[in-house]
A protein has these predicted regions:
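A broad, low-specificity signal marking well-ordered, structured residues that form hydrophobic/aromatic
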Residues: 37, 47, 68, 105, ...
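Short, charged/polar, Gly/Pro-enriched secondary-structure boundary elements
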Residues: 44-48, 56-57, 113-115
């Protein structure tokens, strides 16, 4: 089997808010259709957001319902944190040690999907 394209797709009740959040965080743009938005970075499709009016966000860290999450590796955690928060992310779990050589912080996007900003 040859996979031609691999895309992460998030369910969200508000397509515009969710796709704008991810486009802002990834430095991309949104291409909008009626019930689907695509997020492109440098013209390349990075992820999709599909309309799910009854979307229920996971109850992190319990994971009910269990959902995928993204690990986004960054060079500057402080700058990435500030950008994520300014776009509407919520910090769910701060890093145990910001001075450690590697680590992560857990956030939720506007629809409640967890993601991590990682370093090291």
């Amino acid at each position: 089997m040859k996979i031609k394209r691999q895309i992460v797709v998030f369910d969200a009740p508000d397509l515009a808010a969710e796709s704008t959040f991810w486009a802002g965080l990834l430095g991309g743009t949104v291409v909008a259709d009626d019930d689907w938005h695509s997020v492109l970075v440098d013209g390349v499709w990075q992820l999709g957001v599909q309309l799910a009016p009854n979307h229920v966000p996971p109850d992190w860290p319990d994971g009910t319902p269990q959902q995928i999450h993204l690990d986004l590796h960054v060079d500057d955690l402080k700058a990435a944190h500030e950008e994520a928060i300014s776009l509407g992310a919520r910090l769910l779990k701060p890093a145990d040690d910001l001075e450690a050589a590697e680590g992560f912080q857990v956030y939720a996007d506007l629809a409640g999907h967890p993601f991590c900003l990682c370093w090291g």
